[in-house]
Structures are given as structure tokens and as C-alpha cells.
Amino acid sequence: MSWAVGLWAAHRSPRLGRLAVVVGLAWLGVWVALQYRPDVAVMLIPVGLLARLEGTGAVPGFMLIVGAAMGAAALPRQRVLARVSTAVGAAFFAYGGMWMLQPEPTLGAPTRQAGRVLQSTDYTCVAAATATALGMVGVETTEDEMAGLTGTRPIAGSTLVRAYDGVTRKLAGRATRAVLLSAEVDDLATLPTPMLTSLRLGQASRHMVVVLDAGGETVHLFDPSIGDRWMPRADFDAAYVGQVIVFAPRGG
């Protein structure tokens, strides 16, 4: 759709083509900014919708630019480049949205450690961490249920936004609500526990944990892959993504 709009704009006039490029660049810039600040994104976009758009939301802006470029292309190599870019955009859209077409995972018997839920696969850290945190605030659930609510999929797992969506849906109609916040490491000691966050594992991978105490030189976590874990503050700071899900009384 946005590709066709860009193509139409460029065919209509060079000025409209340039405007389409500017709009596409602005779209990309805003979307990238929202990916870095999901706490702002959930205030602008309903979280249920955002959870489904986060992997594909940049594509309309990109395709608008590509459509305008194709419409303005005068040389054969420019048209070839525009076609290749169109294919790249389509592939990115398919990759980002593929999880919605995948079946939910079939999980084995749950494993608990002192009432906390250990992940049963290498991709269900979000499901296990959210189930653990919810249990700590008095809402019983399972890894299997939270895998469904958080859109967990084999291999790809889930995301912080989908975790927030799943927890929000689980808490619907209850006295407790979830809040997604941006917080510095030094601020975590002032927030109520348990809280959920993701830690960076390399450039692309993320691993969700439950923060139990962030007030000292070590941060006490429940890591659903191994259980209780005490992480040096400097190491935690280096891996922390800057966003947490906390629990608060509804209306408070």
C-alpha cells in the first residue's frame, strides 16, 4: 500500500515524490525512536496492537521511500536497485510478522524452584519469568499459559513488549496492574519488586529475568534458566536494556 502511494506520488510530480521520501524518513525515525522507548510507544499505541506491529512497523515508511524512488528512477540500474529494495522490504515484513503465523509451542511439564517457574525450553524465558513475577504478586499462572499470552514462538521466543501485553491481559479485571517504565539502574532500588526486565546477550539476543533486589553492589535476580542469581552491578548495568515492567495497585 505505502509502496503504491510512493510510486503514485513520484509519477504525479517530482515535488510529491520528494514529499513521500520525507514522510517515509520521518516514519522510520519515529518508529526507531519508539523501539528504543517502548514505555512511550505503549502510551501512543494500544499495547495489543503494538505487540503485533513492533516487528513490521518500520516497513510502511521504508516502502514509501522505495516506491517514490522507483517512480523517479530514470536509469535501468536505478530501477533494478528499487526492485531489489522492494524485495528486501517484503522479506523484512515477512520475517517481522512470521511469528503471528507460527503455532504456539507445546511445552513439557513445568519445573518449579521454591515456587518459581524455570523455563522448559531455551526460548521460553519470557513465559517463565512473567509466570514467576505474577505468582509473586498473588496471581497464579503457568509457563504454558503465559507462553500463549506473550506470543512466545519456537526459537524466536518473545519480546519485552509482548511480555507487557501478556501480563496486562492476565491482570485484566484484577486489583494489580502492570506498568512499563524507563528507568536507570540507580533508580531500580526505588521501584517495587518483583520487576521484569530483559538483559542483552550479545547484539541481538535478549533474556528476560525477574529483578528481586537492586539496592546493593550485586543485583539479585531470578533467572528462569538457572534460578536465583546474584549479578555484579557493573555487569547488570552493561546488560540492562533500560526498561522494566513493575506491578502497582490498579488506580494507584
Report each predicted region and the residues it spans.
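Second-shell loop/turn segments in exported
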Residues: 112-122, 132, 147-157
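Conserved active-site-adjacent core of cysteine acyl-enzyme catalytic domains
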Residues: 1-82, 89-104, 135-136, 140-252
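Active-site-proximal loop/helix segment associated with metal-binding centers of metalloenzymes
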Residues: 125
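N-terminal signal-anchor transmembrane helix
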Residues: 103-111
